[in-house]
Amino acid sequence: MTSLKQRDELQAAIWRIANDVRGAVDGWDFKQFVLGTLFYRFISENFCQYIEGGDPQVHYAQMANEDVPSEVVADAIATKGYMIYPSELFVNVAKHAYTNPNLNTDLSAIFSAIERSASGTESESRIRGLFADFDTTSNRLGTNVDEKNKRLAAVIKGVESLDFGSFEDHEIDLFGDAYEFLISNYAANAGKSGGEFFTPQNVSKLIARLALLGQAEVNKVYDPACGSGSLLLQVKKLLGEGVIEGGYWGQEINHTTYNLARMNMFLHNINYDKFHIALGDTLLNPQYGNDKPFDAIVSNPPYSVTWVGAGDPTLINDTRFAPAGVLAPKSKADFAFVLHALNYLSARGRAAIVCFPGVFYRGGAEQKIRQYLVDNNFVETVIALPPNLFYGTSIAVNILVLSKHKPDTRTQFIDASGEAFYKKETNNNVLLPQHIDRLVDIFAAKADVQYVATSVNHQAIAENDYNLSVSSYVEAEDTREVIDIAKLNSEVAQTVKRIDTLRADIDEIIKQLEA
């Protein structure tokens, strides 16, 4: 079986299981149990592989807890970031899942033990609270202990039945792909609420490629509103292992999504010392001010959310916002995220940020921020994307590309909203690989393409009140039928002549009838 076929079959199976085991429970509400169980299996098998070290004589899952040497425990915590004793492994819990009357409390104790194993170590912040959303006492599992255990057992046995093969034989990231597949499906089915934490992979790939263009290596990659981490992971997939020296950095305000992001890092084989995901409000409580700058910033922040803005008089003196001389409006924080990203961007780096289109043409504070960005030559490109690419919204959003190392003062505008840049599917439009390739090529070339792309000098933008809407600069193709007026007039004349002839013939017939 080819690796891609294996992946497709695995994903079909895991979605079938996810729907079967949830029963009448809404899939969105049940997602943490399926995702958490998949993660539990992954770290168990990953941990076994590490302990056994490829030695066929070592069978860690069959060992007694007390037989694990203390030096092995210390090494595992230092290297992997956590400890899982043999009895706590997924495979051993799954053996007796249907017959264990204490399954829910045993699982809770195991998850707590894994988290406690990192206490006081470098990995603590990556492990602490990781299983917080896997509530084994939740009423979503059932109304009594027996019902809860049956549903937990069904999830565990379902995940156990999935064929991931052995870690050493994986040609593709099966666990990570399965997790991303589940998140994607949950997001698609949840509509608007799902779109808040997941950026579709095709859009993520475009954003990552824009941010990384021309960079063979980057010091660190950062997403200030990282959701489930999908954008950060696209950077990993594009650059591969070892290229990002300082790792992956992100901040997320939603606790459940924050845990999904941390699990996602582990599931894609990013070790605890290579990722930094923080919980909190990026705009009011940024966590990585001492860790900037970043060579690559990718982000799909929430659109037009409210924030305190001018309600907090200290923010105008914040080094992120002060240079613009004005704060983003209280009702629309979009440019606050943009200015935050700009402040964290290195002199050699690039930021690619998804933006609501209104920020590019509205007046007031947003116009002043646009002026600051353009006058200081930070805006490299604005790209208008097709509509209906994201879950939960049909809005045609834009991508703003920021750079601090532009070779000239021109700003590029690309209109990728037309049908030549997407494929229409049942519920959403999709960017195919050829669409992404063409967009990146146009972005890289900076050449004018009729009806698609143009580069505009600073003066022209200033004279247009710093409007950065793509439609203000890229002429839309007139797809109406071209009419040949001379030919049309000739045809009209012939038709009139024919009508006159017919009218004369009719008059002659009437005369004959009256005679």
Model-derived features: where do they sit?
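Conserved S-adenosyl-L-methionine
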Residues: 193-299, 304-315, 320-325, 335-336, ...
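Glycine-rich, flexible loop segments associated with nucleotide phosphate handling
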Residues: 73, 174, 221, 329-331
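N-terminal hydrophobic or amphipathic segments with adjacent small-residue motifs
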Residues: 30, 221-223, 255, 346, ...
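Non-catalytic, mostly N-terminal accessory regions of nucleic-acid modification and defense proteins
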Residues: 1-206, 210-211, 215-216, 273-284, ...
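Tryptophan-centered motif/residue detector
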Residues: 15, 28, 258, 307-308, ...
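A conserved structural/catalytic subdomain of Rossmann-like adenosyl-cofactor enzymes
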Residues: 5, 285, 291-515
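Generic marker of residues within folded, mature protein domains
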Residues: 168, 240-241, 267, 390, ...
